């Protein structure tokens, strides 16, 4: 078979490496000296030639011999690949291997050369002063002491301790070329070793070698943190791998982790030594973890001969979180047991756990341990309650909470068992009651009574000594159907004794006919208890103890044995020498007196022989403990001559000093709450307890209750003056003991009390029936309440127009302070509706911390409300909380925000509606001054000064109502609170409207706006329609839900075709969309115009268009209203200053209006008020009242007046601002022209505008026109003439009493005649005390549309 050329080439290529290896091995360099060992002497010359097939090189020993200066490598003539090594003057340290090799080091020829030097027989390494020998356990170690002379006699010396080792031919040997070989365990103790050789009896030493023991054992490898570790994205990961080894061990660390390829981690190693342990720490760090870093981190350590590894697992969360798992809502345990209630949750980072009991923080003690589990050992009844655990994330302060109820079940305890059971007999035929008082938690479902005939039970005196039940009754029968041996009846009731609820079961025996044993048994889930009562019936024989049953030493008492003198004779008293009949389960009298020898006869006297009975009285004086025991009365039956005995046990107690059980604790409480303090005292005789407050004796009074023998002190409706030092003093015959505690009362004072509530309630109820009678007689339909009650809707805003997100996110809501239960809210009739919500009148039970209910207004969303609308109402709630509490602001009372029902905002209810409607309704009753009788005029001189003083006090009272952030359901402080002497003032509807009222309304609105400004809030829609009238002439500002923080968004702009109240808006607001506090001052000036025009619409007859806005900016202003004074009109002009900075502040307005109010009252006292001429004429002609407007008229009345009071010398508010840089207002200003007085002409606004200046849709305008056609406006003759536009505005005003105009969409207005107004006021003056009962469950009333 022939092979092709290709196949031959392939075979040759495969065999090439084999031939190359053989060629290399055969082609080793050759030396000129053909020996493996060459011996020469010192100072000789070493000359060796090396030849090869390629270039050759020489290597020689690297000893301390300065060989480079004496050695030369040169070429030779034998060939191109030949080199000669020449070493001159050789020395002993030149001993070693000399090698000739090719450049690839694959082939070499070696010759070992001894340079014999007997004066230095050991080779010294280069630079070695001290050598190091590394020793490993259980290994053979070589000490490299090489010899320059062959066949030396060498030994190894070790220090310390000193020891010499010589070669034994086995484990210990010496080799010239290698050194001294010895097992490591023989020299591991040594600090140093060296070799020693003897030549001609002289010893030569090698260099000294330090012995270094090298270990390998790894004791452990730990990871910190270990197991499962949690981190959040962005946090730092630090993982320590710690290795503990024996000494002289080197460790090599290897890490494996998820992001090892990205090399995002840094690793640092550290080693320390402590004692016999060496510690290595390798730290892996990732500065900012991400989700890709999740996984297992493994650390491996190697010492060469030993390996070990460990790992930790890291979980990376995207953000911190807390997830609370489902837990039990009710936990039950038995009295004295131990319970552990764990909190099941997942969260990162580990949250902080805080525990609360009944709303108060609890701390750990010897019986309560806290953490992620609540552990209670040896539970007592005090441990029961509502527990709340609050988990707080320390990073983002996220909280999760869980509340559960801990019930401590108490086995039934029958109180009578703890007392000494009396050994009494019961008279035949008498009615008796046997009682079992049971305390148990939970209360026993039922208390069962059993009975057994006395003769059917056996009595064992031996069991008495053991404290066991001495009665053995086998046939206990349940008492039923009124049968229990005797005619019986079972009664059961629940009582509260010393703060504990107990069940009292009473077995009433109608007629004691049969002696029997009765047993009561109570059972609950924690256990059961029973009491056995001996019921022994006697005929004509009984024992009484006088004066009481509990006796102490040195008392006097008497035992009276009474018997039927026709049945018994020979009565005598004896005393038993031993007590045999008394048991803890009830005593059994001795039925027959058989053992009279055991009795000691006592001297007694017959005290009563009258009638059918005879009484033998045993008198015991100054008794001692020895007088206690069983006393027996023996009587002999006259007919049968048998003896009958009755036993009475007398217990004498040793007097004990009073002893307090526990101590009183200092308390801090809020005004209006209830304090209950228990002073538990033991002592014999029972101590008498007296309470003191600040060292003065405390007696029961209104709100102060003493019960349980004065042990319990209860202070209801705590007031400020109830604070102080309270002392409980307990005294008996041996002395006294006292306990003290200091009570602190905090919070604002509420001056209401029970007596005032009863008085006002009675008066209001009487008024209610009187008004009901008037309504029946007059039969006039009630005015539409929608005009008066819908203003509460104002804060429910269009979420598309107002950015409420910031409100919701930044303003807090504290549910613990503001949340009100829905089941305590009874919804009533609707008050009004808006585009997004509705307002319902409701009764709130207990919202003001009392047991009564209060009428409130509740804001709700309509059905199908969107999430944005829900957030808008929530935003309004938070704004109300942020604004706080003030007398002249519609205040928040509470809210219902919890899931399970609609969102509700509870605010104050103002029954008289908005100020605009009220002023219009009172036009026919307006008088500029108060009417005074002749009797008043006679005493005018004395009274005039009192008016100013009284008003000043009222102003101070009102202005002292400082703002505060309300902390819960606190009842509004009205004028009746700060002015108690005015509590019985007449109803607003019965009083005429006066100039003083108008100024007072203005003053109060200014005061409320001053408060809102102090809270950094801007109203932006201040108008009479947004001012509500409450009791006692108090006005309250509403519709500040759009108020904004002036430091957060001062340039807020409402976009789109929203309806804006242009007539009330300042020029800078109209043109620049800038809302500030000073723009609210402009609106306040317009509000003053409304007030002093008695509710007319501003800018009468003026078309609200671009021309109006231009003229307003140029300085044109409204004319003076019909009922104003020069001072008030000048104040309006000051508020309408074109430069916002020149307008007065609300604080300045408060001061100015307060002064005007005082001045007006002084003028009122003088029957002098300056009014426009038209008003004066109307008053004189129509009412028959004269106004003294001249000095002559003043003299007729013998009064003083100032005829200089007129427009020309009127000063504005600037006179009240000293140092003001603001210029005075001009005396005259340009005003808008009035329309002619044509009352029959119907004026309709063009371009879909209403009097408010709001842009209306055409559909709304048509509705307004239809309403206007239906409404007629009657006026009394007392009302002054007005423009046609003012008349029209009363019927077409776009706002209603409780609802701003641009929120209302389905309400109309009605202005009543004087007769209608009187009836309306009578109907509105409903009783102030709620006419409601406690609601069972929350059930929203249906909201019906109000009639148009």
Swiss-Prot record:
Cytoplasmic face residues: 778-1348
Domain Ig-like C2-type stretches: 43-106, 138-202, 220-312, 320-405, 412-534, 540-651, 658-744
Entry membrane topology: Single-pass type I membrane protein
Keyword Acetylation: no
Topological domain ranges for the Extracellular compartment: 21-756
Subcellular location: Cell membrane; Cytoplasmic vesicle; Early endosome; Cell junction
Region (Disordered) residue spans: 958-983, 1280-1302
Biased composition (Low complexity): 958-967
Primary subcellular site in the record, as a coarse category: membrane
Post-translational modification Phosphotyrosine, affected residues: 1047, 1052, 1168, 1207
Residue numbers binding ATP: 831-839, 859
Disulfide bonds: 50-100, 145-195, 241-299, 436-520, 561-633, 679-728
Domain notes: The second and third Ig-like C2-type (immunoglobulin-like) domains are sufficient for VEGF binding.
Protein name (Swiss-Prot/TrEMBL): Vascular endothelial growth factor receptor 2
Lineage, broadest ranks: Eukaryota, Metazoa, Chordata, Craniata, Vertebrata
Protein's gene: KDR
């Amino acid at each position: 078979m022939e092979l092709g050329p290709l196949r031959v080439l392939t075979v040759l290529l495969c065999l090439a490496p084999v031939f190359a290896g053989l060629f290399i091995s055969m082609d080793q360099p050759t030396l000129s000296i053909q020996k493996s060992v060459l011996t020469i002497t010192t100072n000789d010359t070493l000359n060796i030639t090396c030849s090869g097939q390629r270039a050759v090189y020489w290597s020689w020993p690297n000893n301390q011999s300065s060989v480079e200066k004496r050695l030369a490598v040169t070429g030779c003539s034998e060939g191109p690949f030949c080199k000669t090594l020449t070493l001159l003057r050789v020395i002993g340290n030149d001993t070693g291997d000399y090698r000739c090799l090719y450049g690839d080091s694959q082939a070499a020829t070696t010759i070992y050369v001894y340079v014999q030097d007997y004066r230095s027989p050991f080779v010294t390494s280069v630079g070695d002063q001290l050598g190091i020998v590394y020793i490993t356990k259980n290994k053979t170690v070589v000490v490299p002491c090489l010899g320059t002379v062959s066949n030396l006699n060498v030994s190894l010396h070790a220090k310390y301790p000193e020891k010499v080792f010589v070669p034994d031919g086995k484990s210990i040997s010496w080799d010239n070329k290698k050194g001294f070989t010895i097992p490591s365990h023989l020299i591991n103790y040594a600090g140093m070793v060296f070799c020693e050789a003897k030549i001609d009896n002289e010893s030569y030493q090698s260099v000294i070698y330090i012995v270094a023991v090298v270990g390998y054992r790894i004791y452990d490898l730990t990871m910190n943190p270990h197991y499962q570790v949690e981190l959040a994205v962005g946090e730092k990961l630090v993982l320590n791998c710690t290795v503990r080894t024996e000494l002289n061990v080197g460790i090599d660390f290897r890490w494996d982790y998820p992001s090892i390829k990205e090399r995002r981690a840094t690793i640092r190693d550290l080693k320390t030594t402590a004692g016999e342990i060496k510690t290595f720490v390798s730290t892996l760090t990732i500065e900012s973890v991400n989700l890709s870093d999740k996984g297992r981190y493994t650390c491996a350590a190697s010492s060469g001969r030993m390996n070990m590894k460990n790992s930790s697992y890291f979980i990376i969360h995207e953000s911190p979180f807390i997830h609370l798992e489902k837990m039990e809502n009710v936990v039950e345990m038995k009295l004295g047991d131990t319970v552990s209630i764990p909190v099941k949750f997942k969260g990162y980072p580990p949250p902080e756990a805080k525990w609360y009991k009944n709303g108060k923080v609890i701390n750990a003690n010897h019986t309560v341990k806290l953490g992620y589990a609540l552990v209670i050992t040896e539970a007592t009844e005090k441990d029961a309650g509502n527990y709340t655990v609050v988990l707080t994330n320390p990073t983002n302060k996220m909280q999760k909470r869980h509340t559960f109820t801990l019930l401590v079940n108490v086995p039934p305890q029958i109180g009578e068992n703890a007392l000494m059971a009396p050994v009494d007999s019961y008279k035949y035929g008498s009615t008796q009651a046997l009682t079992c008082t049971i305390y148990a938690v939970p209360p026993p479902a039922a208390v069962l009574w059993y009975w057994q005939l006395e003769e059917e039970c056996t009595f064992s005196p031996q069991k008495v000594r053991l404290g066991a039940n001495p009665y053995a009754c086998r046939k206990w029968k349940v008492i039923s159907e009124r049968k229990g041996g005797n005619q019986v009846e079972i009664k059961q009731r629940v009582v509260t004794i010393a703060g504990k609820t107990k069940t009292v079961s009473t077995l009433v025996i109608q007629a004691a006919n049969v002696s029997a044993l009765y047993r009561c048994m109570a059972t609950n889930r924690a256990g059961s208890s029973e009491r056995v009562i001996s019921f022994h019936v006697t005929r004509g024989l009984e024992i009484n103890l006088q004066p009481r049953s509990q006796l102490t030493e040195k008392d006097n008492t008497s035992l009276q044995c009474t018997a039927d003198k026709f049945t018994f004779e020979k009565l005598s008293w004896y005393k038993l020498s031993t007590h045999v009949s008394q048991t803890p389960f009830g005593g059994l009298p001795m039925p027959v007196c058989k053992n009279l020898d055991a009795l000691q006869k006592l001297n007694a006297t017959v005290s009563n022989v009258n009638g059918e009975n005879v009484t033998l009285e045993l008198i015991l004086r100054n008794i001692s403990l020895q007088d206690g025991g069983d006393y027996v009365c023996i009587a002999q039956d006259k007919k049968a001559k048998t003896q009958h005995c009755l036993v009475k046990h007398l217990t004498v107690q040793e007097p004990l000093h009073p002893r307090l059980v526990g101590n009183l604790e200092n308390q801090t409480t809020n005004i209006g709450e209830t304090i209950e303090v228990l002073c538990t005292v033991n002592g014999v005789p029972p101590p008498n307890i007296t309470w003191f407050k600040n060292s003065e004796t405390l007696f029961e009074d209104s709100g102060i209750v003493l019960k349980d023998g004065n042990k319990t002190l209860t202070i209801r409706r705590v007031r400020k003056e109830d604070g102080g030092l309270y002392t409980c003093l307990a005294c008996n015959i041996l002395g006294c003991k006292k306990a003290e505690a200091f009570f602190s009362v905090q919070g604002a004072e509420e001056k209401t009390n029970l007596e005032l509530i009863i008085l006002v309630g009675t008066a209001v109820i009487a008024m209610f029936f009187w008004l009901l009678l008037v309504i029946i007689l007059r039969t006039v339909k009630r005015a539409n309440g929608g005009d008066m009650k819908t203003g509460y809707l104002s804060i429910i805003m269009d979420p598309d127009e107002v950015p409420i997100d910031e409100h919701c996110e930044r303003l807090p809501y504290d549910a613990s302070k503001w949340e009100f239960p829905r089941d305590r809210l009874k919804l009533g009739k609707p008050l009004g509706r808006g585009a997004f919500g509705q307002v319902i009148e409701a009764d709130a039970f207990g919202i003001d911390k009392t047991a009564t209910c209060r009428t409130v207004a509740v804001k709700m969303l309509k059905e199908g409300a969107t999430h944005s609308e829900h957030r808008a109402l929530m935003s309004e709630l938070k704004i109300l909380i942020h604004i706080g509490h003030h007398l002249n602001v519609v205040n928040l009372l509470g809210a219902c925000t919890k899931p399970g029902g609609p969102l509700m905002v509870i605010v104050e209810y103002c029954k008289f509606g908005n100020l605009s409607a009220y002023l219009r309704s009172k036009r026919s009753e307006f008088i500029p001054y108060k009417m005074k009788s002749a009797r008043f005029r006679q005493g005018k001189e004395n009274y005039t000064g009192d008016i100013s003083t009284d008003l000043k006090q009222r102003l101070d009272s009102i202005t002292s109502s400082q703002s505060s952030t309300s902390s819960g359901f606190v009842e509004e402080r009205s004028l009746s609170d700060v002015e108690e002497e005015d509590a019985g003032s007449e109803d607003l509807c019965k009083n005429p409207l006066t100039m003083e009222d108008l100024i007072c309304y203005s003053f109060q609105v200014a005061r409320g706006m001053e408060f809102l400004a102090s809270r950094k809030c801007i109203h932006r829609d201040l108008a009479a329609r947004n001012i509500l009238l409450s009791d006692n002439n108090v006005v309250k500002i509403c519709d500040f839900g759009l108020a904004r923080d002036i430091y957060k968004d001062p340039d807020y702009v409402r976009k789109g075709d929203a309806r804006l109240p242009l007539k009330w808006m300042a020029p800078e607001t109209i043109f620049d969309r800038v809302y500030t506090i000073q723009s609210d001052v402009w609106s306040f000036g317009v509000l003053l115009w409304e007030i002093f025009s008695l509710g007319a619409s501003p800018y009468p007859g003026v078309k609200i268009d671009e021309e109006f806005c231009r003229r307003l900016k140029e300085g044109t202003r409204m004319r003076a209203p019909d009922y104003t004074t020069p001072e008030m009109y000048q104040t309006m002009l000051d508020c309408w200053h074109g430069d916002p900075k020149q307008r007065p502040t609300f604080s300045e307005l408060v001061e100015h209006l307060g002064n005007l109010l005082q001045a007006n009252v002084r003028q009122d006292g003088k029957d002098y008020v300056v009014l426009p001429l038209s008003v004066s004429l109307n008053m004189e002609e129509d009412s028959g009242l004269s106004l003294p407007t001249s000095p002559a008229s003043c003299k007729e009345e013998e009064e003083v007046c100032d005829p200089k009071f007129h427009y020309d010398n009127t000063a504005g508010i600037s006179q009240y601002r000293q140092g003001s840089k603001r210029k005075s207002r001009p005396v005259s200003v340009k005003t808008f022209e009035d329309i002619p007085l044509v009352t029959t002409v119907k004026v309709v606004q063009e371009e879909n505008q209403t009097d408010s200046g709001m842009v209306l849709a055409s559909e709304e305008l048509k509705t307004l026109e239809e309403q206007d056609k239906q409404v007629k406006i009657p006026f009394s003759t007392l009302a002054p003439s007005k423009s046609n536009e003012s008349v029209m505005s009363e019927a077409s005003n776009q706002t209603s009493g409780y609802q701003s105009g641009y929120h209302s969409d389905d309400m109309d207005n009605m202005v009543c005649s004087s007769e209608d107004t009187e009836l309306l006021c009578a109907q509105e003056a409903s009783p102030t005390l709620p006419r409601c009962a406690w609601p069972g469950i929350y059930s929203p009333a249906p909201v019906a549309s109000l009639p148009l």
